[in-house]
Amino acid sequence: PGLIAGPKLSPRQEHDVELGWNAAKEIARLDIGQTIIIKNGTIVAVEALEGTNEAIKRGGTLAREGAVMVKVSKPNQDMRFDVPVIGIETIRIAAESGVRVIGVEAEKTLLLERDAVIALANDSNMSVLAR
């Protein structure tokens, strides 16, 4: 757990991660989706059938700049078949959409190409943290 890439979070971003975490856990429990996009305490996008990348794009359009993305696992998720994942494409789309922070669930989210994800997040001035 902790900061994986990018700058230290501001108090506002930390608050958005906390709110987004609670909301993401609830939508995951309801089997709606696993990702929330939030800015300044307001949820701007909820992942559903369209998937994470489309939720990021929609959230970025609505938030314009400085959004926070939170991705969690479902309760009792079968980690053999359905692991939450972020990778290069996630970071690229998030950066293009104005997301500045990505929070993921520690030990339950797979970072594909971890070193490349960290490098791209750092190059994009994007914080990535696990909790």
Provide a role label for each language-model segment.
Residues 1-91:
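Conserved mixed alpha/beta catalytic, RNA-binding, or beta-rich assembly cores of soluble enzyme
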Residues 92-131:
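C-terminal binding/interaction regions
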